[in-house]
C-alpha cells in the first residue's frame, strides 16, 4: 500500500458506497435519490472507513474473527463520528437509526455495524488485493495522473457542496431558528397532552 493505492481504495469504496446507498434509497422512495453528501457519486464515509481498514487491519487478513471484530469497531466509530460531524455542520441528520434496536444516539446500530464488519472483512481479505492488481495494469505515469485528477475532482465536489450549504444557511437564518421553535412547541404540546391525560385519570 502507498499513497496512490490508498487514494484508489478511498475513491472506489466511496463510489461503491454511494451506489449501494442510492440504490436502496431509490427503491424505498420509488424515485431517484442521490445519497451522496455532495453532488458527485461519492459517499466519503465509506472511502474513509476503507482506508482505515486497509491500513489498520492488513496484518489480520488471515484471522477472520479478528478481521471482523476490527472492521466492526472501526466502521462503527467512523460512522458515529461522521454522523455527529455532519449534523453539527449541516444542522440535520443524514441518517437516523433511532427506530432500530441497539442503537447509539441514532447514529449507529448493531444491525448495520454487523453488516459493516462483514463487508470490511471481505474488502480487506479480497477486495483490496483485487484493486491493487487492477492498478498494476496501468502504466505508472498514467495511473498517477488519473489518481491526482480523480482526487482533485472529488475534493472540489466536496468543497463546493460545503460552500453551497454555508451560503444557503447564511441567507436563510430563520430556517434553523424556525426548526428550534417548532421543536420547543412540540415539547410544550406533549407536556400539555400528558397533563390533560393525567387529570382525566385522576378524575376517573
Listing of model-derived features with the role each one plays in the protein:
Residues 1-204:
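Aromatic-rich, lipid-facing transmembrane alpha helices and their immediate juxtamembrane interface loops
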